[in-house]
Amino acid sequence: MGSQSNAFFAVPQGHHGMLPAADRDERARQEFIRSFKAFIQSDIVPGIHATYHHEVKPLHEQRAGHPPRDRHEIRELMTQHPLFRNYASLQRVSQELLWDVVLDSIERTLPDLVARARSQGKHAQGSLTLNPKLSLPKYAVGVDIHCMPGGYGGEGGPDDVTAGALYDRGVYLYALGMMGPMNDDIGGSAAKFVRDRFPDFKPRRILDLGCTVGHSTLPFVDAFPQAEVHAIDIGPSLLRYAHARAESLGKRVHFSQQDATATNFPDGHFDLITSSILFHETSAKALPAILRETWRLLAPGGIAVHGDLPPFWAMDEFNQFMLDCETWYNNEPYWGAMREVDQVALSIKAGFAPENVEFCMAPSAYRAAAGHDRSFEAGEFAPGNAWQVLVTRK
């Protein structure tokens, strides 16, 4: 079977040698979750907007003499409204069900997935280096981020690939297929941004921080075929899957289990460093350390491009409130706090010159090619048709 699809998805998920196979019943349950999530976005979220702007906000202005001052005050008001309470409950239920239905097919086929991963590693172009002595950061293992069972650091055995398989299929369902067939829109958009913005830039070595299963890593292999590409993450199961997935797609990447705050690479080793939706899944202590490590690892003239959603100063208070629901209902404790951090100031403090730090927008490569807009307004992959990128140069 070349892809897993139904009429609801914007595009079928692209096939590769590690994609977990779902039987008929499992596909039906996965399709239900996808349509359930699509219903929340298309039928309930617009009602949340209307309720706030036409009911909650005017009533508060009448009583208090001023509009709600910030997302926190909006939250205090909206959590009293039954429509928002229903929305928040449905969002949480849909997320927990998502992982449950994907996990069914992974647990059923896990021996085959492990065997496939071993087979892909026998004649590898790239490499996989794990470090069982690595102390996993508390922010990553103290909570199941995205409500994903086991989180990023979960591991069920010495050859386990469960976390990687769960993340790969789960992200596709969570994003409603809008990240493209290979879940790679952030990486593809960032890679295209670098090529368009710096047409003469020829990186010799590239590093992807917090690569998970390599969704955003592989576009850089294609964009810069002459470069040696490395990718790191803290989860061994994620990395086993990432390595096997990349090999099945014919992409040469060197994966290693490392903490992005303190890697074992030498000073100035990379010409290009990238990350995709990493910052908001770290912590107030880790983020400055990651920026300092980025500065250390960049060669003179090197470029770093970190893709994420916009900081709160770039949106109005209501959209801040809607996006901050990820903090409250999707096990993302640093989601809201990160968007209040002055990333430019942190980058300068890490060593980058002020004139070499800027926020830019990287247009969505997938949506531009597909010719359609993003169809949902809340969650990890919203809003708009571009990714906010923090660009730093050394």
Which stretches of residues belong to each language-model region?
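N-terminal auxiliary segments of SAM/dcSAM-dependent transferases
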Residues: 9, 14, 18, 22, ...
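Conserved alpha-helix/loop element of class I SAM-dependent methyltransferases that forms part
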Residues: 166, 180-202
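Conserved class I S-adenosyl-L-methionine
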Residues: 202-212
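Class I SAM-dependent methyltransferase SAM/SAH-binding core
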Residues: 207, 217-262
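A short acidic, Gly/Pro-enriched loop at the edge of an enzyme's catalytic core
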Residues: 261-273
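A short glycine-rich, Lys/Arg-flanked "PGG" loop and its adjoining helix->strand segment in the class I
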Residues: 288-300
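C-terminal alpha-helical "lid/dimerization" subdomain adjacent to the S-adenosyl-L-methionine
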Residues: 305-369
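Core SAM-dependent methyltransferase catalytic element
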Residues: 350-356, 363-394
